[in-house]
């Protein structure tokens, strides 16, 4: 049966199964969802078996369970290891959603729900393509699946799992659908990812919250100090001021900068889409360079003092911030973590105590476009979308990708189908049904060309 016909005939069941996953609020960042993590893993194992896997196991790790499945068609054939994650980001702020984030809806040709794209929807694309190949006796490669439940919190348990199960995870290439394209009519393959380093900063002043009238002006305010510290991490030209930060940053080759410059990009449309009047970033680089192949610093959250209704004249005892740096290949996140912490402690005034706690991180990654699996993915996109995909670096991070290369010795092809408008990590996450269908077609074509 031709793939388009297969999708049309089976789509109601496909969506029913996908929705059964989405309805499970597998939020790894919240301990109260511990049972949901197991439920989601078990549901995935069941769906892998139904799709045609020989076996599907829910395996223990140091954290949330890991789903492993496989179908071996020939011990001498090539093996593809499909990686995905079943955990999702918290849905807050809930009031900004147009529908229940964990009760999927189809509106205007899109599936709307938390995880519709990242990563339940995209990983489902992989599994449905696999299912089609199995049922139509077209699968000529061995396929293994590893689905984790901690990607959104930095994959703290996956490296040790890979170390313990190297033989089980042995493969020729890893295939991942957890990245995005440049546009619905502009398919692209991700050839690089930025790394990540993440910290929490705690600033402590007096031993208790104080009356701002009695003590204001005489005692350092931790929130004021925290803001001052953060303001010194970048300069007016958007460069990070941490000593040694740029030591291992590889300058983008001119040939790659020229390629980036040829990518269709409407800056006015970009600003309009996110409702900002002007853009800002490191001087000397374009917007597409800044958010893909240059490092960056961001404050992800900041809090302290009184934030309830009305007013309370208080000089708070503590202030906190969660901050992160996106890193580029060759920057070691452990080294950057140390440099950053040392710098923050060095510039902190004596009037407060400062604690910098590293959270999670990971290395950047680059995929060579000469890789046979990459070229098979190119053919997949060309078949499904009608045009050859552009090769682009993306600004996001999937820390485990570099770990796979280090621990398992396997390269990864990032065959993602997301769009910026899919609003991952934000309210009203969605995925267009048209892209969902084309994604299945593209992955099928990948397997037909990777033998």
Pin down the residues of each PLM region.
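Flexible glycine/proline-rich, aromatic-decorated loop/lid segments
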Residues: 188-204, 413
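An extended, acidic, His-containing surface patch that forms the Zn2+-binding/catalytic region
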Residues: 50, 183-184, 241-318, 329-342, ...
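N-terminal helical capping/dimerization or prosegment-like subdomains
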Residues: 1-94, 318, 335
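Acidic, glycine-rich active-site loops and adjacent beta-strand->loop/helix elements
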Residues: 86-88, 110, 146-155, 177-181, ...
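Active-site metal-coordination/substrate-binding segment of hydrolases
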Residues: 77-144, 438
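A generic structural motif
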Residues: 117, 207-209, 325-333, 362
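Acidic/histidine-rich catalytic neighborhood of metal-dependent amide-processing enzymes
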Residues: 117-192
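Polar, glycine-rich mid-to-C-terminal structural blocks
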Residues: 206-209, 213-270
């Amino acid at each position: 049966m031709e793939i388009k016909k297969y999708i049309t005939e089976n789509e109601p069941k496909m969506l029913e199964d996908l929705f059964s996953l989405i309805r499970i609020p597998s939020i790894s960042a919240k301990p109260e969802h511990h049972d949901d993590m197991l439920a989601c893993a078990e549901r995935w194992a069941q769906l892998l078996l139904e799709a045609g896997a020989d076996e599907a196991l829910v395996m223990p790790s140091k954290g949330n369970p890991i789903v492993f499945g496989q179908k071996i068609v020939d011990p001498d054939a090539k093996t593809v290891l499909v990686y995905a994650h079943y955990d999702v980001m918290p849905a807050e702020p809930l009031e900004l959603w147009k529908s229940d984030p964990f009760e999927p809806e189809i509106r205007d040709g899109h599936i709307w729900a938390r995880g519709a794209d990242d990563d339940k929807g995209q990983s489902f694309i992989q599994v449905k393509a696999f299912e089609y190949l199995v049922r139509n006796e077209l699968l000529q490669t061995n396929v293994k699946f590893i689905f984790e439940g901690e990607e959104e919190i930095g994959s703290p348990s996956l490296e040790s799992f890979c170390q313990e199960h190297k033989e089980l995870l042995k493969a020729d290439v890893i295939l991942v659908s957890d990245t995005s394209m440049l546009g619905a009519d502009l398919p692209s393959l991700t050839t690089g990812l930025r790394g990540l380093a993440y910290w929490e900063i705690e600033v402590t002043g007096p031993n208790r919250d104080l009356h701002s009238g009695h003590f204001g002006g005489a005692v350092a305010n931790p929130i004021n100090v925290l803001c001052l510290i953060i303001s010194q991490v970048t300069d007016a030209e958007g460069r990070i001021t941490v000593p040694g930060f740029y030591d291992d940053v590889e300058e983008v080759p001119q040939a790659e900068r020229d390629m980036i410059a040829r990518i269709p990009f409407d800056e006015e449309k970009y600003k309009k889409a996110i409702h900002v009047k002007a853009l800002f970033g490191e001087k000397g680089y374009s917007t597409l360079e800044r958010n893909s192949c240059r490092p960056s610093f961001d404050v992800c959250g900041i809090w302290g003092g009184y934030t309830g209704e009305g007013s309370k004249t208080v000089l708070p005892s503590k202030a906190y911030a969660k901050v992160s740096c996106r890193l580029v290949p060759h920057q070691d996140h452990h080294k950057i973590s140390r440099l950053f912490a040392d710098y923050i402690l060095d510039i902190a005034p004596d009037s407060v105590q400062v604690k910098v706690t590293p959270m999670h991180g990971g290395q950047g990654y680059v995929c060579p476009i000469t890789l046979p699996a990459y070229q098979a993915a190119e053919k997949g996109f060309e078949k499904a979308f009608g045009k050859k995909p552009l090769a682009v670096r993306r600004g996001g991070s999937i820390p485990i990708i570099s770990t796979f290369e280090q621990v398992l010795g396997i390269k990864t092809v990032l065959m993602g189908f997301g769009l910026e408008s899919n609003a991952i990590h934000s309210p009203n996450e969605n995925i267009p049904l048209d892209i969902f269908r084309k994604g299945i077609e593209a992955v099928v074509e990948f397997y037909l060309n990777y033998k």
